Each structure stands twice: as C-alpha cells, then as structure tokens.
Amino acid sequence: ASPDQPIFFGGINVYLQHKFSLFRHTPKWIDKAFDSKWLLRKAAARSGMTSSKDLGEITLSTFRGEDGPLVKEVNKVLTWFKEQGSPDILFLSTIMLAGIGKVLKRELNIPVYGFLQGEDSFLDSLLPEYRVEASKLLSHDVALLDGCIAPSKYFGDLMAERLSLKPSKIKHHPNGITTERILPAEDVPSSPSLGYLARLCPLKGLDILVDAFIELKDSGNHDNLSLKIAG
C-alpha cells in the first residue's frame, strides 16, 4: 500500500475511543499519531492480550457505527470519500463493515454491496452475551445495503438464515483466479502432489487434509505423493 494511504479504524484509536470519551474529540494530529505504522505494529504484537470481554464490547461499538462511540472514525471515512470523489459503486470486503456501508450509501447516494466470507466463524467466537446483540446489529445494517455477495449458495443461504435476510439480497459468485495468462509448466513433476491454497487453519479443513495425506502415505500405495500447502 502507498505510504500516503490513509488508515481508518486503526486499532489504537478504536480502542481508546471505545474506552474513553476524551479520545472521541481529540484533534486530527493526535489521531494520526496513533495511526502511525510503528505504533500499530507494536499494538498488533500485543493483540493476544485483548480479553474476550474487550473483543465483544469493541465489536458492538464497531457495529453500532454512527450511533456508537466510534462515530468519529465513521466520519473520517465519509469525509475522505467526499474529498476524493464518490465511486460509482462500493464493495465492502466484509459485511461486518455494514455499519459504515449504510452511512456511505445514504450520504454518497451510491449502491453498496458487502462480501460474505467467514462472518459466521467470527460471530461464533464471541461470548454469548455479545453474540446475540452483534447478530442483531449486523442483521439490521446489512438489510440496508443493496445486497451481499457470497462465494457459494451454501454459505449465502446459511448467512441469510442467520441474519434474517431476504434471499433476493444474496448474490453468488464463486471464488477463483483468472487463468488467461497462466501457461502449463514445461517440466511436469514425475511424482503427484496434493495442493492446498487457503487460510491455514482448522476451519478450512487443513487438519483433515493432513490426516488424510498421512493415511495415504501409510497405505504404501502412494510413496511418491507429496503435500504442498500455501495460504
């Protein structure tokens, strides 16, 4: 990313504005200092110290958007778009940004869509007392967007049910890559391999794949088989 690229909802500013009302009214130069890459890297290294309670409360503050303690961060995003020029259409990388998306849709008068990608896992990781409220807030804000884009019909149907969304709100577009400029390898390996390209975590089934690979190797019928993973 460009060094001049603005940072929105920087972790330090979000935490301070969530915890202390004083930081909801600080001048821009202070916010910019807290958004320095050096400080954010330091904070990221200590992210494991955030308690489940803090995570739940900050999630609710973020989802509340303009109606919560992080309204200053929402306005920063809106101001940036007004200064740079409104896009013809806006795609949110995740529907968890719907609280911001609904504001941009209303104030910029543009269509806004959100991608569905693993929000169920995040919601399930919250403590029960925060999970219910977070789901309600998300359901309300996502319904105000022009629609959602799911990587599969299964996940689209799952999230539509969880967030009480109309089926017409969900569009399906499978993940993939453009292969037009990719040429076949000239030197094809003589031994076969299993490939995995996704997030390296049990939620994606990587542990099951590894167990299956071990069983294949132990069978004695696939001595030359290798497992190649990336993500």
Segments from the language model and where they lie:
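A short, histidine- and acid-enriched strand-loop-helix "catalytic/donor-clamping" loop
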Residues: R64-E66, A98-G99, G114-R131, L144
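Conserved donor-binding/catalytic core segment of Leloir-type glycosyltransferases
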Residues: D187-K204, V210-I214, L227-K228
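Membrane-proximal helix-turn-helix segments that form the acceptor-binding/catalytic region
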Residues: L78-K82, R106, Y130-C148
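A conserved catalytic-core segment of Leloir-type glycosyltransferases
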Residues: S2-N75
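A short beta-strand/loop micro-motif in the catalytic core of glycosyltransferases
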Residues: F91, A143-K153, K228
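Short N-terminal targeting/anchoring amphipathic segment
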Residues: L78-L97
